[in-house]
Amino acid sequence: MTDRFQLVSPYSPAGDQPAAIDKLVANFEAGLAKQTLLGVTGSGKTYTIANVVQQVQRPTLVMAPNKTLAAQLYGEFKSFFPHNAVEYFVSYYDYYQPEAYVPSSDTFIEKDSSINEHIEQMRLSATKTLLSRRDSLVVATVSAIYGLGAPEDYLSLRLILSVGEHIDQRQLIRHLTDLQYTRNEFELTRGAFRVRGEVLDVFPAESDTEALRIELFDGDIEQLTLFDPLTGETLRKLQRYTVYPKTHYATTRERTLSAVDTIKEELKERLEQLYSQNKLVEAQRLAQRTQFDLEMMAEVGFCNGIENYSRHLTGKAPGEPPPTLFDYLPPDALLVIDESHVTIPQIGAMYKGDRSRKETLVEFGFRLPSALDNRPLRFEEWEARSPRSIYVSATPGPYEVRESAGEVTELVVRPTGLIDPVVEIRPVGTQVDDLMSEVHERIKLGDRVLVTTLTKRMAENLTEYLGEHGIRVRYLHSDIDTVERVEIIRDLRLGKFDVLVGINLLREGLDMPEVSLVAILDADKEGFLRSTGSLIQTIGRAARNLRGKAILYADKMTRSMQAAIDETDRRREKQVEYNLEHGITPKSVERPIADIMEGARDDAAEKKSGKGRSKSRHVAEETPDYRAMKPAEIAGKLKSLEQKMYQHAKDLEFEAAAQIRDQIQKLKAASLG
């Protein structure tokens, strides 16, 4: 393990990259707080940032506007820094229905959610890494501005173990339960521990492949060992190990009991207010709900919706911002805002939407006023907490340009020599028929096509129409979850279908070199989806292909269209000059089609885990290499195998059930590895 970033790449900076890297690093070292990197599609923005990270050697937080792009960036940074700690921090909810009240119909909607355990583990790993390593790079979404447990509590609760240290076994077990670990003697799962004589096995909450064995003798720690929880194979012996809490929201018993007292005081004040306003129903409701939560906290240290009491648990004053991922960052860190023209407005919008929903809950007696402090950061609070920053975008917004005070570094020349797509304008009247003929031409060449429409209805109708005419087409919309969205993009690249239709999901950062045509329907309808920035971003999706072309269907030239075409032409001219000067022949970008969540694999670790698992005896027949499968495929396969296993067991076909059980174990091992 090293505490220095080591960039691994088969190529060196070229084109505008060397000058951009030098300028960004020089500005950072000079103490410049904000700067902007204006990089066109395919110019190597991620690679440029990776070079900056290696040169400045600071812990780095990269913020992306959505989970799809965050996953892509995570994979790229994992491949650039295979020997360093690259982590992923996004919302761990697969499904989330927030608590809400609709006064007009007197409807209360209970909070309902489904947590993705794997992403929860990655979040815990990210915070542990930020607190313990300098060579940490975390890729996050706006989830980073939402409340977490205070880092002071998180650090004060950790359990530090050293070989030779004297520790009472009961005290050790009590400390693990304070960290919210659960005792499970039958199955060692993540966030659990088991006791066998003087041996304790702990599966750390932030780990997915390694568990810790603590061997005691006469009250002393005799040995600390990391082992594979699946096979029991010893991986390595340690002199020292730190066990971190199972959740970011863990807190001490004293803090919890203190919070109970302050919540009671707030409840008393709030009830007096409600009674004085003659709101008897609201007062009764609030007293009943809060008393129940207080009893749960006093007895078990936890209650449903405990995050609504986070102000009391962290000891913050009313109105103070909650602790977030930014509190885990060291003060000398680097912040990179990717696709800043989208991410920055997102950060500003989060607080307002959350506030309006919670004010209704407080007004009608569902929550105490302190629930308003369980919130994302306000924009000005986020600004105050942000370390030195680099805004990255092909179309920086006015905020980024203003904050950078003119320090805009351009990355216009592509090392591949690729020039920006040719932009053509065609009439709206025949747009669908014209599009079909263009699609057929591209399919003959083995290329892919992106089509953007203005409305969901139009996208659905167009998808149906193209499908009826024998074109393999899919429709990408907001109802599709993150993992499936990534799968659709991957299937497009693999050629499982040729045309992808969408509305606003085909813009920022998606890396699809196989796409040679982007069609923008109704391009002359001025608005958010057809602004200058949106048009430049959408046109840019075809910029990674040698035959890249963008067709704008419009009956009149709008100001946004003219500005987008002028900017595209400017970039084309600069690239053509560079190609002539350096004798470069443009060639399409070639990028392997892998699961973007996988990143780089550690070959040594893979061999080691493979070796260990081959020792264990299985009933299963030879099965395919599950490690080549994607997370969504693994999840689907697991579900199907489990159903078959239970059916065989029900039919008393135990050998068949045992074979499937072992396939499931291999599949789970592959998803962890």
Swiss-Prot record:
ATP binds at G39, V40, T41, G42, S43, G44, K45, T46. Residues 600-609, 618-628 have a biased composition (Basic and acidic residues). Pfam families: Helicase_C, ResIII, UVR, UvrB, UvrB_inter. GO terms for molecular function: ATP binding; ATP hydrolysis activity; DNA binding; excinuclease ABC activity. A motif (Beta-hairpin) lies at residues 92-115. InterPro entries: Helicase/UvrB_N (IPR006935), Helicase_ATP-bd (IPR014001), Helicase_C-like (IPR001650), P-loop_NTPase (IPR027417), UVR_dom (IPR001943), UVR_dom_sf (IPR036876), UvrB (IPR004807), UvrB_inter (IPR041471). It is found in: Cytoplasm. It comes from the Bacteria. GO terms for cellular component: cytoplasm; excinuclease repair complex. CDD domains: DEXHc_UvrB, SF2_C_UvrB. Residues 600-628 are annotated as: Disordered. Belongs to the UvrB family. Forms a heterotetramer with UvrA during the search for lesions. Interacts with UvrC in an incision complex. This is UvrABC system protein B. It comes from Xanthomonas axonopodis pv. citri (strain 306). The lineage of its organism: Bacteria, Pseudomonadati, Pseudomonadota, Gammaproteobacteria, Lysobacterales.
